[in-house]
Structure formats: structure tokens, C-alpha cells
């Protein structure tokens, strides 16, 4: 019986063993697959990234779309938006909660084009980011409780602002692709200007 299980369902057995041996349980996975092969490949990729002790893997289009781009469904003003979506999209770093995260209501192609916009200072003032030319709707998630999963709790903030992102060169496709969302900067309610560094300056 055991030999049959090992030879016919090695991946299933591996997943069961991982569940038993890991001190932290993985997020529940939806088993209502539209495309079993694609979903299983995504699960294997997630497990590899989740349990890796090495450096974070370089970003991919699929990874950015899954973790950042908003899908139709829950209202952006919902106070539990971040708690629900971060769990559903498995937005974690190794076994730890991310301290902040952004979900954006835009197409991936639009986000990628921002990589070729002018540089502006990131919100930490150290690195350089690319800024969107227009306003984008999104949700900012800020960690309020716990540091390790599954106890992550977030406060959700709906925003409409300019997206600041960092990008990385991907050799396989010879293009810049989004790497991280640095900020979603809301413009002042009254008249303002952008100086040459892309920073908002309030006129006297």
C-alpha cells in the first residue's frame, strides 16, 4: 500500500509530510481548480519560495500579477480588504508577515510601463523609484499585529495617488519589470506642484 502511494502520488505524499513536519501550517489552498496542472505548478512554486532559506527569487510577471494586481470582487473600501487578500494571495516573506503591502487597481502592462518613467526619490529618500504619470486607485496594507503567520493582522487604507515602484532587469525577456511597490502617494487636496525631483511642493 505504501509503495503504491509513493510511486503513484509522490507529490501528494511530499505535501502531506511537509504539513506534518512544519511547525507552521500553510495557508489553506483552494481545491476548486479550473486548470489542475497550472494550479499544481503554482503551488509547487509557492512552496519553494515559502520554505527557501536563501535570497528572495527575482520577480516574474506572474508573481507580480498574483501579489499586486487587484481582481474584481471585494470593495476597496472594505476594512478587512488587506486581511482577506493577503491570505488569499499568500503574500508572506518566508514564515513572516510583510510589514506593508500595496494592491493596485490597474493592468500589469500599465504597471510595467512605469518602469520607463522618470526617476523620483523613494519614500525612504535613499533609493530611486519610477513614478506613474497618472493617479491610480489602490489599497495600502499596514501590519498591526503579529510578525509570523498565520497571525498577521492588517489595517486597510484606500488610496488614490501616484505609484512609486522599483524595477529590475529580466534577462530572459530583455525588459524592465516591476520589482516592488514603494508607495502610493496621495496628492494634496489643494493646488500643488512637482519640483524637478518629483517631490510635491506646496505653494505659499
UniProtKB/Swiss-Prot annotation:
InterPro entries on file: RNaseA (IPR001427), RNaseA-like_dom_sf (IPR036816), RNaseA_domain (IPR023412)
Main location: secreted
The keyword Kinase is annotated on this UniProt entry: no
Signal peptide: 1-26
Protein name per its UniProtKB record: Inactive ribonuclease-like protein 9
Recorded family membership: Belongs to the pancreatic ribonuclease family.
List of glycosylated residues: 130, 142
Job of this protein: Does not exhibit any ribonuclease activity.
Entry-linked Pfam families: RnaseA (PF00074)
Keyword Transmembrane: no
CDD domains membership: RNase_A (cd00163)
Keywords: Disulfide bond, Glycoprotein, Secreted, Signal
GO terms under biological process: defense response to Gram-positive bacterium
GO cellular component, one term: extracellular region
Subcellular localization, as worded in the UniProt entry: Secreted
Cysteines paired by S-S bonds: 97-152, 115-167, 122-129
Organism ancestry: Eukaryota, Metazoa, Chordata, Craniata, Vertebrata
GO molecular function: nucleic acid binding
Amino acid at each position: 500500500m505504501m509503495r503504491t502511494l509513493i510511486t503513484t502520488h509522490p507529490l501528494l505524499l511530499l505535501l502531506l509530510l511537509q504539513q506534518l513536519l512544519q511547525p507552521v501550517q500553510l495557508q489553506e489552498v483552494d481545491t476548486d481548480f479550473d486548470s489542475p496542472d497550472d494550479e499544481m505548478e503554482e503551488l509547487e512554486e509557492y512552496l519553494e519560495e515559502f520554505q527557501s532559506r536563501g535570497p528572495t527569487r527575482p520577480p516574474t510577471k506572474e508573481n507580480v500579477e498574483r501579489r499586486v494586481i487587484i481582481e474584481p470582487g471585494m470593495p476597496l473600501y472594505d476594512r478587512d480588504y488587506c486581511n482577506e487578500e493577503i491570505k488569499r494571495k499568500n503574500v508572506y516573506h518566508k514564515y513572516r508577515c510583510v510589514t506593508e503591502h500595496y494592491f493596485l487597481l490597474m493592468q500589469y502592462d500599465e504597471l510595467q510601463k512605469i518602469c520607463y518613467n522618470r526617476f523620483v526619490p523613494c519614500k525612504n529618500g535613499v533609493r530611486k523609484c519610477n513614478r506613474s504619470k497618472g493617479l491610480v486607485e489602490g489599497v495600502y496594507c499596514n501590519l498591526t499585529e503579529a510578525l509570523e503567520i498565520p497571525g498577521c493582522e492588517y489595517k486597510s487604507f484606500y488610496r488614490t495617488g501616484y505609484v512609486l515602484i522599483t524595477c529590475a532587469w529580466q534577462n530572459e525577456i530583455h525588459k524592465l519589470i516591476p520589482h516592488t511597490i514603494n508607495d502610493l502617494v496621495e496628492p494634496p487636496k489643494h493646488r500643488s506642484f512637482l519640483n524637478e525631483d518629483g517631490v510635491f511642493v506646496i505653494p505659499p
